[in-house]
Amino acid sequence: MAVLEIKDLCVSRDGKEILKGVNLKTGPGEVHAIMGPNGSGKSTLAYTLLGHPKYQVTSGDILLDGESILNLKTDERAKKGLFLGFQYPTEVSGVGFSHFLRTSYNALSKALKDDEREVFITVREFQKYLKENVNDVGLKDDFLARYLNEGFSGGEKKR
């Protein structure tokens, strides 16, 4: 079963049709890149997935774990695991990067589980996991102690 499925999606903004019949299926653990020239609808698709009010779905459907999300508000979609990673992310003082990663990890773990059990990793377990793996993506240990996106280089933000 597809985790995210977009079926013949048509989207307009201010009465102008931007997306025309978009289809996409993603499976568990898959990573996809949406690429295209300026004005091709990449941002429109991202904002539509998150339920931005300026974008109207005129036909088609968006399914997350087999259920339509078209009637869900943005925060409800986020609780189900849909997030948008910005090209130029805002700095968030007071929110630790490792806390953000753990929250994301727990949301993804829950979404990938086949049963209804809670599957949260403790702070201690996650800190150990991070220390063992942070170097694999070319980052230093002090990276984890920073606030979200605060003082990161462009390359660090992308990682």
What name fits each language-model region?
Residues 35-40:
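The feature captures the beta-strand-to-loop junction immediately N-terminal to the Walker
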